[in-house]
């Protein structure tokens, strides 16, 4: 490590220790609440999708969901001229489903030569933080859309999409409301298909699988980029004019499926789509669970950051969403 780089890194460690009221950042410590919130905000800001959903800090590792759903409509009328009385309705969905935040490790390293290349940059400390924040955001998306289990010892080789790190949103829906999940549907113009096109599939799923009191403007289709590409690629290919191609490419970003706004999100399964209000998806982090430890490892010519936090992926109300997967 270059002498100037060493000086920058030591200042970084000193600042981390100062903010967290510890003597030494190279000894494992619990992150201060205010710093913890800033770290979580930095992660969220690096991903457009993560800025659209809920990020909630909870006190307990396990407990009741924070938001409440509704289990029916509430508008009505009662003729009280006789013996009948007006009756209130409980708007809270009664559910035994609880959240549980699992410890997740985000351990990274940066080699000395990379740090040396940053030594003349005034934002040296910000670069150190940003490198980790970006990858944590990517991992959260990958877990949210692909996670199916919580393994004591995760295996990145057999689970390249982090399927064994935590239980993601799609798996939560499969486990807790299987009736809101369709699979194996065929889409196309041939006679043996279930739907003539993706629009028909989305329209049917929204009206058949989601409770009617959630049929409002907040419903969004979350899809893999392949579904969007399959629908509009032939249009782009048929247009050689740059202006027309740009217009069509822009259309793919904000297009409607079945009359609903649609967004393509990285790491979402290519053969699936989910319909839900974005406010129905949450990531819970247990307050005070973030721990940090920095190690200067000359044996490997790198610095290492060991970060962990307790987190979970929550669907607030299963009645407000559905999943169509395994599309053929």
Can you name each region flagged by the protein language model?
Residues 22-35, 142-154, 215-222, 245-248:
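Short glycine-rich, low-complexity/disordered patches
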Residues 2-47, 164-186, 193, 228-328:
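Sequence/fold signature of self-assembling virion shell proteins
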Residues 26-109, 161-165:
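Assembly/oligomerization interface modules of large self-assembling protein complexes
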């Amino acid at each position: 490590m270059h002498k100037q780089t060493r000086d920058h890194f030591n200042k970084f460690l000193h600042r981390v220790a100062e903010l967290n009221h510890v003597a030494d950042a190279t000894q494992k410590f619990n992150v201060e609440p205010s710093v913890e919130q800033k770290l979580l905000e930095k992660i969220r800001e690096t991903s457009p999708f993560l800025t659209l959903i809920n990020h909630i800090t909870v006190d307990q590792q396990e407990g009741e969901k924070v938001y409440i759903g509704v289990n029916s409509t509430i508008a009505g009328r009662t003729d009280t001229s006789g013996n009948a009385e007006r009756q209130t309705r409980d708007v809270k969905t009664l559910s035994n489903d609880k959240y549980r935040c699992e410890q997740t490790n985000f351990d990274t390293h940066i080699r000395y030569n990379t740090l040396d290349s940053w030594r003349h940059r005034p934002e040296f400390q910000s670069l150190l933080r940003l490198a980790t924040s970006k990858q944590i955001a990517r991992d959260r998306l990958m877990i949210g859309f692909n996670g199916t289990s919580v393994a004591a010892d995760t295996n990145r080789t057999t689970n390249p999409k982090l399927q064994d790190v935590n239980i993601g949103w799609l798996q939560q829906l499969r486990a807790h409301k299987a009736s809101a999940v369709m699979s194996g549907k065929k889409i196309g113009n041939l006679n043996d298909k279930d739907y003539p096109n993706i629009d028909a599939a989305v329209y049917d799923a929204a009206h058949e699988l989601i409770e009617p009191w959630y049929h409002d403007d907040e419903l969004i289709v979350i899809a893999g980029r392949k579904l969007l590409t399959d629908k509009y690629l032939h249009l782009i290919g048929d247009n050689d004019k740059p202006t027309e191609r740009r217009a069509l490419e822009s259309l793919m970003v904000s297009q409607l499926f079945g009359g609903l706004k649609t967004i393509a999100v990285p790491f979402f399964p290519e053969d699936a789509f989910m319909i839900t209000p974005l406010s129905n998806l949450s990531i819970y982090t247990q307050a005070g669970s973030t721990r940090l430890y920095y190690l200067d490892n000359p044996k490997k010519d790198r610095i290492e950051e060991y970060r962990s936090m307790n987190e979970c992926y929550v669907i607030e109300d299963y009645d407000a969403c559905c999943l169509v997967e395994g599309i053929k």
